[in-house]
Amino acid sequence: MKKSLQIGYLITILLIFFVPGLLFVSGKGKSAPDTEENRTLSAMPKLEASTYRVFPTQFEDYFNDHLPLKDQLVFANSYLDYRFFHSSSSDQVVVGKNGWLFYTGTQQGDEAQMKDYLGENLYTEEELQTLASKLNQAAADFQKRGAHLTFVFNPNKSRIYADQMPAAYGKPAENYRLKQVVQYLKANTKLDIVDTTDVLADYHKKNLQNQIYFKYDTHWNSFGSYIATGLLAQGLKRSLPSPDAVSIQDGKHPVYDLARMLHLQDILTEDPAPIVSGYTDRTYESQMSGEGAEIMIHGSCASPEADARKLLLIGDSYGTFMFRFLATEFAQTTYCHYSQYHRDVLEAEKPQEVVFELVERNLSLLNSFSIDRAFPQ
């Protein structure tokens, strides 16, 4: 029996190693042209006198792209890593307790989410002084054009769900960059700063049954966003009902971005996607333009109970969650992704209130923020 099992394992391993190669040579079972990587697949290189030096590398790229059963093998590897070894097949994702996924934050800019968590990317005193000076200047420039500026900072998922982080990372640092920036700006400037960390952490601690961030995604869910937007609304002299006073229904589950990074988006689907209702009787109409990072959303609320001020929300993807709750509070609300913001947007919208929103991992974008742009040139 034991010998038969060993032979079975050996045959399985041989099939895994040799079947894709045999199919590749025979030209059968080629991978589909559409991949999760969203790029053009490598073409078969030509072996010529002028290309013989680079041919091996080019052929390797072609082989990797067109290997038969590639997608199935990638899926199998990711599934085994996640389900049985509680590890990640991607350097962009770590697997935490109870199957929770966390983003390592290294895809763009100087994101360093694990350094945020461990407090390893603190600013120096000089850097804080420079940052405060820049933001003071930005607020003054907006004020000259009749717009009051508010900053709102939202915590990383690992900050709120530290209880689900891998044990190897330990507890989150007591002092970390977001906390450092907020404390410095509040102590040394008159800027309006809203930090939603404490209100979200307190809610999670007292209400473990209500999930406020997605398990398989980098983002908070709609309910978590509602809690945070309630705090922002107070800073804008508006108010939203208590989280305990609203209704929550389970909505359509999105494709979770961290699950997609592991090629497991088709099986990691059991993750609450709450829809919040009952917080207002007011409605709004919206128009959306652009896609992805180029998205802009314009909302208008005709209710006489809506604030007559025009609001411009400049932010990252977390801001899109906040938009729907703000859109019923103001007569006109516009969301603009930070990468698309420039002075022309301000001149076109002519808001009385401007909110610059960032999730913790994007905090370094503060160094680039001005009335002219919110993204490095």
List each model region and its residues.
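Extracellular glycan-modifying ectodomains
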Residues: 1-377
